[in-house]
Regions:
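Conserved small/polar residues in nucleotide/adenosyl-binding loops
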Residues: 198-203
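Active-site groove signature of glycoside hydrolases
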Residues: 103-112, 153-161, 176-197
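An active-site-proximal structural segment forming one wall of the substrate-binding cleft
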Residues: 93, 141, 168-186
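The substrate-binding groove and active-site-proximal loops of carbohydrate-active enzymes
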Residues: 70-86, 117-132, 162-172, 192-197
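N-terminal structural segment of carbohydrate-active enzymes
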Residues: 2-104, 109-111
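Acidic/aromatic-lined carbohydrate-recognition and catalytic surfaces
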Residues: 100, 106-161
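Aromatic-residue-lined binding/catalytic grooves and analogous aromatic/hydrophobic interfacial grooves
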Residues: 4-7, 11, 149, 183, ...
Length: 210
């Protein structure tokens, strides 16, 4: 089915039959925040980078107690080795569970990507840390099963200079190009974009928001 870049055409699309019948999928939060792997009850461990900015938070107290003085979130790159990660093992487990699709967090609000991105130089799992393309590895492994590969992608990044300066400029120069890169490179069956960031200038030409 071909859709035009107007709202009437985009709104005419229907949920794919496979997704309506899928019933069960698996959402995978795994990234740099998995190194400290900490949060207080009722909070999100993947928000660790943000939480330790608050001097009074439980995460900050944990951080100061466990890690050397001056340790920054960015320093966790050296500890993100993923030496036990086996994409085929994951894929087989997902299929055995009965899941019909998965969504891997390709990038969370910390901006760290689990794929090589031209828009996240030196802040992705290929350039630094484990030096592996986890999106690519998992997609390839899942193609040997009946489980469909999908991705989650954070719309905004807490401390990206462009986002802090001008969210619309960030969307046009960083977010949308990275999304196009991700979709073109991996052709995911599902794309889950998280958090509201809407730029009226480019939206009609580039994206559909639902």
């Amino acid at each position: 089915m071909h859709y035009e870049n107007n709202w009437e055409s985009l709104n005419s699309r229907h949920v794919p039959d496979w997704f309506a019948d899928a019933k069960f999928g698996i959402f995978i939060h795994w990234g740099l925040y998995s190194v400290p792997a900490y949060t207080e009850k009722g909070q999100y461990a993947e928000w660790y980078m943000q939480q330790i900015r608050d001097e009074n938070s439980a995460a900050r107290k944990f951080h100061d107690r466990v890690y050397a003085p001056g340790t920054q979130y960015e320093d966790f790159v050296s500890g993100f080795k993923a030496e036990l990660f086996d994409a085929d093992e994951w894929a087989q487990l997902f299929e055995k569970s009965g899941a019909k699709y998965i969504n891997l967090v390709s990038k969370h609000h910390d901006g760290f990507c689990l794929f090589k991105s031209d828009y996240a130089w030196n802040w992705n799992s290929v350039d630094v840390g484990p030096h592996r393309d986890f999106c690519g590895e998992l997609k390839t492994a899942l193609e040997k099963t009946d489980v469909k590969f999908g991705v989650y992608h954070s719309v905004y990044e807490w401390f990206h200079p462009l986002y802090l300066k001008d969210p619309e400029e960030y969307a046009v120069k960083h977010l949308i190009p990275m999304l196009k890169e991700l979709i073109t490179k991996y052709e995911p069956w599902t794309l889950f974009t998280d958090c509201l960031l809407y730029t009226s200038d480019a939206a009609d030409d580039l994206i559909g928001v639902d």
